[in-house]
A protein has these predicted regions:
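Short aromatic/hydrophobic "clamp" motif used to bind/position activated sugar donors
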Residues: 83
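A conserved acidic beta->alpha catalytic loop
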Residues: 27, 38-47
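Conserved donor NDP-sugar-binding/catalytic core segment of glycosyltransferases
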Residues: 94-126
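A short, conserved alpha-helix in the catalytic core of glycosyltransferases
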Residues: 142, 147-150, 154-159, 163-192
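Non-catalytic, C-terminal membrane-associated alpha-helical segments of glycosyltransferases
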Residues: 210-218, 229-287
Length: 287
């Protein structure tokens, strides 16, 4: 019988993340297969990583697929029962997998997702959502997407992630759909993960504009999908007029960066309301 730790394949979606990916890979046991989906046409990354790490397969997507679609591509190549979704700017602790295995045994494999605990107050979970089954394992409504173990045997979606979402709320959407089917999601408090937000895909101003555009697009799409038109429209109405006010103010004070940021936020919201795809990419942005 295959052991728990040997039944895990790591899936990492990258976008020119060579400056941080090495530490991530080195934190993973060399006996585990790692599938990296590189959301670019950079074949030099594939050659460099595969020459250095024999347990790694780098798939060049040829375009920027985004987080959800990229992970779906990686998961489609997984042959083990478990897929560990990991961001390139995250790395695991020496006890991470051992503590997840302890939780897996405690839960008797009756879970859809278990996730390690971010060492600095992982996420913003409300205590009212916790169901204490032990001091170390907590049932939650959602976990953060930068590190989570999927039990593929217990997830029955044709596409794990919603591929209409390019960035933001993809894991929240997945957790919501799992909970709607009475699936179980747990946070393992003693299983630690370390994460440096936003380092994985760069931090240029163009990237920030892209992130703000997609935040507004995804927020409206998620609310419409899971909460209905009334809540989606109510939130959109407030966001729309707040963005208009901020745009006007930034013009008055001649703050170009704030103007562009709020203009892109407004654009993302409008595109989502009009049911247009989440098309914008950092390389499309011209300042």
């Amino acid at each position: 019988m295959i052991s728990f730790k040997d039944n895990i394949t790591f899936v990492i979606v990258t976008f020119n993340s060579q400056q941080v990916i090495t530490k991530c890979i080195e934190s993973i046991n060399s006996n585990n297969r790692i599938i990296i989906i590189e959301n670019s046409k950079n074949y030099l990354i594939k050659k460099s990583i595969e020459n250095k790490f024999k347990n790694v397969e780098v798939v060049i997507a040829g375009e920027n697929l985004g987080y959800g679609c990229g992970n779906n591509l990686g998961i489609s190549k997984v042959k083990t029962q478990y897929a560990f979704i990991l961001n390139p700017d995250a790395y695991i602790d020496e006890n991470t997998i051992q503590e997840l295995e302890t939780a897996q045994l405690l839960l008797k494999d009756k879970f859809s997702i278990i996730a390690p605990n971010f060492y600095n107050n992982y996420g913003n979970f409300s205590k009212k959502n916790y169901i204490d089954i032990s001091r170390k394992v907590l049932e939650v409504d959602f976990v953060k997407g930068f590190a989570m173990l999927l039990n593929l045997k217990n997830i029955n979606f044709r596409s794990i992630f919603d591929e209409k979402i390019f960035l933001f709320l993809e894991e929240i959407d997945l957790c919501k759909r799992i909970k709607n089917q009475n699936g179980k999601i747990y946070l393992v408090s003693d299983s630690k993960i370390y994460h440096s937000e936003k380092k994985g895909s760069g931090s240029s101003f163009e990237v920030e504009l892209c992130r703000n555009w997609h935040w507004m697009w995804s927020l409206y799409y998620y609310n419409l999908k899971h909460s209905g038109k009334f809540k989606a429209y109510t939130i959109a109405f407030n966001k729309f007029f707040l963005s208009i006010i901020k745009i006007l103010f930034s013009l008055i004070v001649f703050n170009k960066k704030k103007y562009l940021m709020n203009r892109y936020r407004l654009s993302g919201l409008v595109y989502s309301i009009l049911n247009k795809p989440s098309w914008i990419r950092p390389e499309n942005i011209k300042i």
